[in-house]
């Protein structure tokens, strides 16, 4: 491509990438409202414990997992534009519905108001009734939220495959994937103040409504590259630059039609699918553990609830580190390819190995935090661990575009996301039961010098730190070298 052509090339693909970034930000804002209102608002109102909260987050994970199994196929079937619109519409409605759980619980349990529920004696039969009813109502709302949110990543990955050549996909994915970090970053600064000023119900409604605004822009901005009036010939040629390489490959090995659909069950016959499943199963739950439990961790261990400036800035700092560091997730393999001459897959796997060491920082979070009695140390270390996850995740998603034809990308992405949801379900449920047991057992529960709930947190941090290296070695053994799927 000549210099003149480069100068004339449009950049509509980056505008769409920014829209994917916003959608992912809204996605994680909606998901984060519960964790930031749980400890100080919802827990006392509904008489919950960590086991109740763990049940709800675990259900969200497994329902999200099941939805992901079909979400990718749904996006492939409906098309990127309609599929994405439906997904964000459903999850935005589900987010807003959380606001009705307080009124509904009071009505079903026979109370005049939510204030009357809060005044019930802890441990009484009435408190048990309130917690049971409210948990089921939250399960319903989280199920609707999960059903819609499951479509976000399959649709976004499909857009990057449509609009970016292979060498740019990891970078584009890291940009929109950073929306997860930015959503978590913005959440502690806006959600607790909203809940304190207007009530936790309005926090769900206001954040949930953002998705409906996004739908308007998506409806008017997205078309396939060949059909978009905003993409000129130069940009279209740049987007399809891999076609020549693939045409050469077809001479020695016949290649399936790039848009050919693949059945859901056939996906499980490929090692490349199991490679992606492994990466998601072992590591997705780590990110969700940090997302769901970090606010409660700082509140319990360092007396820094999100209703205080310290608690809000701890979460903000954690995800600021994630946002800044994780951008390197897409840049590093790009550097390996362009500067070192590596094949995209080889460069991506090397980058993932490097990023797999970042979560080891989580092993030091609890010991150093308790040793120096400072919440800032675990905030920084957990931030580095979570940044490693986001960088890892950007490259993990991009391996699908490397290995599978475009017509199968969303389906395989959904299968992998299902595996990640199942892994997360186990982590959330185990964490909830572990923390409740450790808190009740007190000094009788010990692990590596820690007692009670701190011991429970350290156990979870140990798994989080080691999960990525375990996953990488299994993935490498499944697909040692670049080998595209032949349908």
Language model: regions and residue ranges:
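Residue-level signature of mid-helix packing/kink "hotspots" within the transmembrane helices
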Residues: 32, 61-69, 150, 184-185, ...
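Cytoplasmic helix-loop-helix junction between adjacent transmembrane helices
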Residues: 141-181
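C-terminal transmembrane helical hairpin of 12-TM major facilitator-type secondary transporters
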Residues: 345-395
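C-terminal ends and interior cores of transmembrane alpha-helices
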Residues: 89-131, 353-371
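Helix-loop-helix hairpin linking two adjacent transmembrane segments in secondary transporters
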Residues: 180-229
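Primarily marks hydrophobic transmembrane alpha-helices of the MFS/SLC 12-helix fold
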Residues: 84, 138, 349-352
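Extracytoplasmic gate region of multi-pass secondary transporters
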Residues: 34-36, 267-330, 389-393, 397, ...
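Multi-pass alpha-helical transporter architecture, strongest
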Residues: 214-222, 362-370, 457-487
